[in-house]
Amino acid sequence: MAPRGRRRPRPHRSEGARRSKNTLERTHSMKDKAGQKCKPIDVFDFPDNSDVSSIGRLGENEKDEETYETFDPPLHSTAIYADEEEFSKHCGLSLSSTPPGKEAKRSSDTSGNEASEIESVKISAKKPGRKLRPISDDSESIEESDTRRKVKSAEKISTQRHEVIRTTASSELSEKPAESVTSKKTGPLSAQPSVEKENLAIESQSKTQKKGKISHDKRKKSRSKAIGSDTSDIVHIWCPEGMKTSDIKELNIVLPEFEKTHLEHQQRIESKVCKAAIATFYVNVKEQFIKMLKESQMLTNLKRKNAKMISDIEKKRQRMIEVQDELLRLEPQLKQLQTKYDELKERKSSLRNAAYFLSNLKQLYQDYSDVQAQEPNVKETYDSSSLPALLFKARTLLGAESHLRNINHQLEKLLDQG
């Protein structure tokens, strides 16, 4: 031990060492600032309360441990290796690139981080609809190593997720135990217990799904049984002849049920007096029911007939209104036709009278000619009854006399002038 009064002499450091230390501190501070600025650089979009923080912690551990490692990132973050051996080789190469003094520490850290990564894979498998965020291209050269490491961790997560899905599908098809699946699908030895937990979780999910299906089938069966029991129960209805299904009422169903309950109750009673009283009560009630049903049926029939008569009356009333409108429209035409009819009737009567007169006149002339032929030497005598005929015959003679008088008067005028 050194005495208290003495101070340890500081080792002399060269300017190159100081500069390298300053540059390292600057790079670390710039990395921290870049990590704070570029928060959306994570490949998967998880909620804040999920286990994605483990992925961030893995990236920070890799920052502290592997400042000099460089990886070539894949074409996209969801790249899958063709074979499990390729994945194990790649993991072996990445592990061999670390310095030998830090391999033990790295393996212990990765075993804890891979468990948290697989838990985050569970969440991402439940939400397959999430999309990847593009990695920003505007980051500086200092941030390139960090982004490559994060892409590498995302690649590991995606490969483990696809391997878990493949192994679960093969286990469902072949129905093999989960131990053989986990032994085939694990690459590094530290990830085996976490993958076994994953398989157990998937098996529990499949069991719960099967239980849900079984309960759904049971519900379907119970529903079908209930429907079958409902269909097996037949409802008896009392309906008289000529009754329609639309006229069925509550009493039509109550009466058969009343008869059924009466029979059941009568079988349980042993006293004759009670049976007689129940029988009389049953008969009276049944008669009342039947009377009410008949009266209700009669009432429905009367209502139906009344409705039919009302509809017929309404139709006839409508037709009467139409006829009245038509009569009002044809009334002037009727008047015109009536006047024409009266005129034609008068003409017909006048023509009939004229024809009768002419026939009588012809008969009279025929009689006169016959008498004159039989007695030609007898002188004709005319009485007062034949005066109109004589005037009619003398009209021509009177006309000739007046004509001669006119001629004589004109000749006298001419002579006087001359």
UniProtKB/Swiss-Prot annotation:
The modification Phosphothreonine is found at T78, T98, T110. Pfam families: CENP-U. Keywords: Centromere, Chromosome, Coiled coil, Cytoplasm, Host-virus interaction, Isopeptide bond, Kinetochore, Nucleus, Phosphoprotein, Repressor, Transcription, Transcription regulation, Ubl conjugation. The keyword Transcription applies. Residues 297-356, 397-417 form a coiled coil. Changing T78D: Failed to enhance the PLK1-dependent degradation. This is Centromere protein U.
